[in-house]
Amino acid sequence: MTHPDLPRTLRHRDAALRVSPWRGRTDIVVAGPIPGTQPSAAQVHTAVEKLFAAGVSEVYTTALGPPEQQPFIAAGFSHREHLRLLRHDLRDLPTPRAPASHHLRRGWRRDYAEVLDVDAVAFDGFWQFDRRSLVEARNATPTSRFRVADASPLDASPLDASPSDDRTPATPPSGVVGYAVTGRANRTCYLQRLAVHPRHQGVGTGTALVCDALQWAHARRADDVLVNTQEGNTAAFELYLGLGFTDQTNGLDVLHRDNR
């Protein structure tokens, strides 16, 4: 099965699922409801059976809250991973902090290779991004911000640009040690991804990237910022709490179903 054979959206009556390959594989996919929709169990079942008929062997869901999970569980999905969900109300912003070892700048498409190298060592295999995952994270919301922490000298990097400037720098940047993708939809912002190279953790890199995301969200008059993190990622959880996020009660879950 090739990429063109995999539908990006599966529609059944009035509900739809957004579908994408899992880490470049088309025999394993990620599916989730289109924002603002709530499919029934029958609609989920029909959509998944279409995927199985097309040659898909396994389906993972996007991270879902308890109400969103119900039709998938009723359609035969089981829990695979639990995520903690945290929220920042943007009322008391932390003071931006910039470690002397690097600077923050806008991320470019030319950074993707280095960014994905960082991602590969920051997360275990199940959670790692590939290029398509990164692009989808940037495009998941109407507006987004892509920032990188760069350890190269300032005079070796292109000048920063405004969020609306999509020009490509003449000189490709280097020295990426961390990155963040933040998106805004309606009045809520989402810290879609935060990754720091293990060799640069514990020196303020993650703090600087999160503070940047919060400042950006506040400047765009968002009501809050949401972020999720793996249940066992204590370092990230404590980082968010220390910067003013609060733990939400139920969290999120990734569900799974295979073709058996």
Can you say where each PLM-predicted feature lies in the sequence?
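Conserved active-site alpha-helix within GNAT-family acetyltransferase domains
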Residues: 65-81, 203, 207, 219, ...
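Conserved acetyl-CoA-binding loop-helix of GNAT-fold acetyltransferases
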Residues: 38-49, 196, 202-215, 219, ...
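Acyl-donor-binding surface of acyltransferase catalytic domains
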Residues: 33-100, 253-255
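A short helix-loop-beta-strand connector motif used in the catalytic cores of GNAT acetyltransferases and
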Residues: 2-8, 13, 55, 80-82, ...
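Conserved beta-strand-loop-alpha-helix junction that forms the acyl-donor binding cleft
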Residues: 60-69, 198-201, 227-237, 253-260
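A conserved beta-strand-loop-helix scaffold within acyl/acetyltransferase catalytic domains
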Residues: 130-145, 150-151, 172-195
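N-terminal charged segments
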Residues: 1-54
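A short beta-loop-alpha structural element at the N-terminal edge
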Residues: 103-115
